[in-house]
Structures are given as structure tokens and as C-alpha cells.
Amino acid sequence: MAAVLEPAIIVEMSRTPDITVAAVTETDGRFLVVEERINRRLVFNQPAGHVERGETLLAAVVREVREETAWGFNPQALVGVYLWRNPSSGRSTMRFAFTGTVADHDAQQPLDRGIVCTHWLSRQDLVEREQRLRSPLVLKCIEDYLGGTRRPLETVGDLDLQTAHTVSAVAV
């Protein structure tokens, strides 16, 4: 019997999705999260943020964790890649979620603008605060992590910027 293919899901996007990274890091059943102020509202999120121009995905997640939590982050695996459309703003985000360990906390380092504080919360703690999660991606990443989803870091490749510049110049 032939396999039945499901119809393709069409994602309507007003523009190119924002490329973001997030860190899922667990210690003793608790996850490192930030409490941040977004549009005058306090919400919970993984340490996460946009990839800056010229930055690799791995460099971006290491930087974001340091800036938002004052912890050093050592990525160990890719948990998943998630495309999400915010129904309120219409903006789309493609999130690359990595798992890894943290070390070298710098208690003297000020946290990134907008970050109120950091917490170590269990999955249940986050479920109980579901209305205060920045997006559904927060729990989805944790659930995938707890379900054992891991991909090698080599799954995510970066094209050398000099090579990319040469190739794009030839392609034009």
C-alpha cells in the first residue's frame, strides 16, 4: 500500500523570519531561564536572541547566554529548529535551540538590557507560569529536550564568509 502524503503546510510570512538561537540547559531537573521585560510585561524565556551579522549560530548562542545570564555556555547538541509565527505581531521566527552546560558564572557582570533576573525552574514550574512564557517555543524546546531529541552540532553548518562572498559575487 502506498504511503499517503499529508498536504503541505503553507506558512504565511510577512517577511523573512528572524533567525534566533536559544539555550536549553538543565541542572538537577531545573532549566536556566531569564525573566525579561517585553512590552511592559514580565515574561520567561530561555536565554535567547538574534544572530548578529557575520556570527555563526554557535557563537551567537554562547554570546546570548553570557549576555543574558552571566554564565559561560558550552553547546553540546542541537535540540531542534523551530519556525513560529507570532499571531499578535505577524512576525516569524526561526529558532535554533541548543543544549549544553554552563560554567564560569560572573556574578559581577550586569545582565543584558531588559533582563530582570535569571532563574532555575523545573518544567512543572514553567507549566504553572505558562501565561507568562514569551512564546510556546519555551516549553516546546524543553519538551523536545526531555524527550531525548538531540542532533550533533555538525548538523548545523556555517559557510565560510569569505567563500560565501566570492560565490555570491560570481552568482550575480
Identify the residue ranges that each predicted region occupies.
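Unchanged
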Residues: V51-N74, W84-L137, A164, A169-V172
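Conserved Nudix-box catalytic region and its N-terminal flanking loop in Nudix hydrolases
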Residues: T27-E67
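Short, low-complexity, intrinsically disordered N-terminal peptides in bacterial proteins
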Residues: M1-R15, S168-V172
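A residue-level structural signature of the nucleotidyltransferase/glycosyltransferase Rossmann-like core
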Residues: T16, A23, V43, T118-H119
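Residue-level preference for beta-strand/loop junctions
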Residues: R15-P17, L42, S92-M94
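Short, solvent-exposed loop/turn elements at beta->coil junctions and helix N-caps
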Residues: V11, V79-P87
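Charged phosphate-binding loop/patch that engages nucleotide di/tri-phosphates or the phosphate backbone
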Residues: I142-V172
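Conserved N-terminal beta-strand and adjoining loop/helix that marks the start
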Residues: P7-L32, T99
